[in-house]
Regions:
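Short, intrinsically disordered, charge-balanced linker/junction segments flanking boundaries
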Residues: 243-247
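The right-handed parallel beta-helix/beta-solenoid scaffold, focusing on the short coil/turn
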Residues: 10, 16-23, 28-30, 35-40, ...
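Gram-negative bacterial Sec-dependent N-terminal signal peptides
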Residues: 1-6
Length: 247
């Protein structure tokens, strides 16, 4: 786990107690935030690819640091270390946020959010071709998923929508949205609307299907699912469903 970054001569450091506003990071620039950074645009940091520990550029939010209203464009990286917090980040396609601290109200417009062990993401909105990956030991709450199911029912498209290896709580899945709950993952209190679906290889608790679909695969368990009008629960060979209510 990376908790610090070497301070090079070309780096910009926002010291504790200091507030900066505006600016753009390009061409391997670093901004190391111990204070508060508002309204930054980040266009560098992913030179070695998504979620790669070798990446060194971009914006680094350290313990006690805060970043608000950040824009992350293609190739840009916002890294939030343990004890750091960010809010209202917008991430375009090709950009990413690596999260070990806290993030509130992130919008993924084709971008990616990787929530690592100890990280907490609240209120993320995942739009077309965006992806939220919740790793083991991480938590995402109140996520809205608007992408992932464009390939059709029960077609796992890879890195779009929401993939849960840790814990997802109170996720809303809208039309074209998909939540994939991996074998080690748990999804609690998910609501799935028409045109969206939940694919379960791990554990799904108290899912409500308001016209949406739930696929429980081999090894997956679904408990307390409520199937409302036009909803559909499909329990495959080796899958388990208990305490289902069909309306």
């Amino acid at each position: 786990v990376v908790t610090s970054v070497p301070v090079l001569a070309a780096d910009t450091v926002v010291q504790a107690g200091e507030t900066v506003s505006g600016g753009t990071l390009t061409n391997h620039d670093n901004q190391i935030v111990l204070g508060t950074a508002n309204g930054m645009t980040i266009s560098t940091g992913l030179e070695y690819g998504p979620d790669n520990e070798a990446n060194t550029g971009g914006q680094w939010i350290q313990n006690g640091g805060i970043a608000n209203n950040t824009t992350v464009t293609g190739g840009g990286l916002q890294r939030v270390n343990a004890g750091g917090s960010v809010s209202d980040t917008v991430i375009s396609a090709g950009g990413g946020q690596s999260l070990q601290g806290q993030a509130v109200n992130t919008t993924l417009n084709g971008g990616e959010q990787w929530v690592h062990e100890g990280g907490i993401a609240t209120g993320t909105v995942i739009n077309e071709k965006g992806w939220q990956a919740i790793k083991s030991g991480a938590v995402a709450t109140d996520t809205v998923v608007n992408t992932g199911a464009e390939g059709g029912p029960d077609a796992e498209n890879g890195d779009t929508g929401q993939t849960v290896y840790g814990d997802a709580v109170r996720t809303t899945i809208n039309k074209n949205g998909r939540q994939i709950v991996a074998a080690e993952g748990t999804a609690n209190t998910t609501v799935v609307y028409a045109g969206g679906d939940q694919t379960v290889h791990g554990h799904a608790l108290d899912t409500t299907l308001n016209g949406g679909y739930q696929y429980v695969h081999n090894g997956g368990t679904a408990s307390g699912t409520v199937v409302n009008s036009d909803g559909w629960q499909i329990v495959k060979n080796g899958g388990v469903a208990g305490n289902t209510t069909v309306n």
